[in-house]
């Protein structure tokens, strides 16, 4: 068989084999077997040197034509197989709309936000409305209108962040409590009765410990009207504690001092860990403080636009983080501001 006959036979076999190729891996093997450096076409071309000189041009042209034919066939087959592979990939990625959907990941509210909403719900059912007041406050509203004139010793109860202001401008500070909101709520409602809660962030220049943070939330509450007495304050706080910590929770009131209330009290609940026996959490007292309260001082009522001779009122202030700590047994307030997912995902 002449070299050209062998070439014709090789071309026929190669094209026939190409028609049987079903994937790109087999196509690569076909290319190596027929068109590679050690492939069948290259091995056959080595016989060109043994031909008579007059036959070499014809045989060389035939070799070039055969190579071109096989390469063109290879390109067509490769393009077709790639289209098929893309189609298979597309079909594999298609979503079966008849299958049940995947539920999206559900986020969680921060435990402070959860406690705030619980407080809103309980006090809202008692007729209290939510008010907001500025976080950057004047010295007048943060101290003076709350019965703490300049140089009053009660100011030492709070370590204050002051804001730089131009000479002659009012002294500005980051509010140390939400009590300034009392004045805003009073002046907006006087001389009419009012029940309001004033939640928000407070700031104090304190060392950060397991019990203290420089930034924290507080909820202030006031109720003003005719013939409001300490009994109303007591009934409100006891009902609030029972809603938050469970029916039958033991409570007590202790005398205290706040410049904007008179008389002033601390409101405690029985320690839920030791049942009143005394433990590390309650400092062996058997009780846990949850808020401060009292009857609004006549000076504060007057500064809010009310006549203390005709109306009276009570006020209370609580820390949502502290109340959440008591409710969930959290021993370090710094967790609330850590952003640690291990902590937040528990709520």
Curated annotation (Swiss-Prot):
Cofactor note as given: Binds 2 magnesium ions per tetramer.
EC class (word): ligase
Catalytic reaction list: tRNA(Phe) + L-phenylalanine + ATP = L-phenylalanyl-tRNA(Phe) + AMP + diphosphate + H(+)
UniProt keyword Aminoacyl-tRNA synthetase present: yes
Keyword DNA repair: no
HAMAP family: Phe_tRNA_synth_alpha1
Family: Belongs to the class-II aminoacyl-tRNA synthetase family. Phe-tRNA synthetase alpha subunit type 1 subfamily.
Protein name: Phenylalanine--tRNA ligase alpha subunit
Organism for this UniProt entry: Roseiflexus sp. (strain RS-1)
């Amino acid at each position: 068989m002449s070299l050209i006959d062998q070439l014709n036979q090789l071309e026929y076999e190669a094209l026939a084999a190409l028609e049987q190729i079903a994937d790109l891996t087999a196509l690569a093997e076909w290319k190596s077997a027929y068109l590679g450096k050690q492939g069948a076409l290259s091995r056959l071309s080595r016989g060109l040197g043994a031909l008579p000189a007059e036959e070499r041009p014809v045989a060389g042209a035939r070799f070039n034509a055969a190579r071109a034919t096989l390469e063109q066939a290879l390109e067509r087959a490769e393009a077709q197989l790639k289209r098929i592979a893309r189609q298979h990939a597309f079909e594999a990625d298609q979503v079966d709309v008849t299958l049940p959907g995947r539920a999206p990941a559900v986020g969680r509210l921060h435990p402070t936000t959860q406690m705030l909403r619980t407080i809103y719900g309980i006090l809202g059912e008692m007729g209290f409305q939510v008010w907001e007041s500025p976080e950057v406050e004047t010295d007048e509203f943060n101290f003076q209108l709350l019965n703490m004139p300049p140089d009053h010793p009660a100011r030492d109860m709070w370590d204050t962040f002051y804001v730089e202001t131009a000479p002659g401008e009012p002294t500005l500070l980051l509010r140390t409590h939400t009590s300034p909101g009392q004045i805003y709520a009073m002046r907006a409602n006087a001389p009419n009765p009012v029940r309001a809660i004033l939640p928000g962030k407070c700031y104090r220049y304190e060392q950060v410990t397991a019990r203290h943070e420089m930034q924290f939330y507080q909820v202030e509450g006031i109720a003003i009207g005719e013939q409001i007495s300490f009994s109303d304050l007591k009934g409100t706080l006891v009902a609030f504690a029972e809603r938050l910590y469970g029916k039958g929770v033991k409570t007590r009131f202790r005398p205290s001092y706040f410049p904007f209330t008179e008389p002033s009290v601390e409101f405690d609940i029985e320690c839920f860990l030791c049942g009143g026996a005394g433990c590390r959490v309650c400092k062996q007292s058997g009780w846990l403080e949850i808020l401060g309260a009292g009857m609004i001082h006549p000076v504060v009522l007057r500064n809010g636009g009310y006549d203390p001779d005709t109306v009276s009122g009570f006020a209370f202030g609580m820390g949502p983080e502290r109340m959440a700590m008591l409710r969930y047994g959290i021993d370090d307030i710094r967790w609330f501001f850590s952003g640690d997912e291990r902590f937040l995902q528990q709520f």
